[in-house]
């Protein structure tokens, strides 16, 4: 159960709960990948491989109330920084 941001505020940004879940999930995966790649780049002796952060989608807010990637994704959605691409959304519905 999420307490912040509220589901009602989040649903003002997307058209359905399903869209909200899909958008938050995809963004959370991007955040996780960015954090892992950033850690690997900072610790090349422990990571075992070199990692380039070019092309990764960095964190969009300066401060997050949540430490978990799903919560961070929801905060970005509430701020209007992460949205559904209407062209891609229409393709999925066909």
Curated annotation (Swiss-Prot):
What is a biological process (GO) this protein takes part in? DNA-templated transcription
The catalysed reaction is: RNA(n) + a ribonucleoside 5'-triphosphate = RNA(n+1) + diphosphate
According to its UniProt entry, this protein's organism is Limosilactobacillus fermentum (strain NBRC 3956 / LMG 18251)
Mind telling me which HAMAP family this protein's record contains?
RNApol_bact_RpoZ
Its taxonomic path starts at: Bacteria, Bacillati, Bacillota, Bacilli, Lactobacillales
Q: State the name under which the record lists this protein.
A: DNA-directed RNA polymerase subunit omega
UniProtKB keywords? DNA-directed RNA polymerase, Nucleotidyltransferase, Transcription, Transferase
Q: Name one Pfam family in it.
A: RNA_pol_Rpb6
What is the enzyme's main class? transferase
What does the sequence similarity comment in the record state about its family?
Belongs to the RNA polymerase subunit omega family.
Listed under GO cellular component are: DNA-directed RNA polymerase complex
Job description of the protein: Promotes RNA polymerase assembly. Latches the N- and C-terminal regions of the beta' subunit thereby facilitating its interaction with the beta and alpha subunits.
Which branch of life, at top level? Bacteria
InterPro entries tied to this protein: DNA-dir_RNA_pol_omega, Pol_omega/Rpo6/RPB6, RPB6/omega-like_sf
EC number in record: 2.7.7.6
What molecular functions are annotated in GO for this chain?
DNA binding; DNA-directed RNA polymerase activity
Q: Which gene encodes it?
A: rpoZ
Q: How does it assemble?
A: The RNAP catalytic core consists of 2 alpha, 1 beta, 1 beta' and 1 omega subunit. When a sigma factor is associated with the core the holoenzyme is formed, which can initiate transcription.
């Amino acid at each position: 159960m999420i307490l912040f941001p509220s589901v009602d505020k989040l649903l003002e940004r997307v058209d359905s709960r399903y869209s909200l879940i899909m958008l938050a999930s995809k963004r959370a995966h991007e955040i996780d990948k960015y954090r892992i790649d950033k850690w690997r780049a900072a610790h090349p002796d422990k990571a075992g491989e070199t990692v380039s952060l070019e092309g990764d989608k960095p964190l969009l807010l300066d401060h997050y109330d949540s430490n978990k990637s799903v919560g961070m994704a929801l905060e970005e959605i509430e701020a209007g920084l992460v949205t559904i691409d209407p062209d891609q959304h229409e393709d999925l519905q066909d």
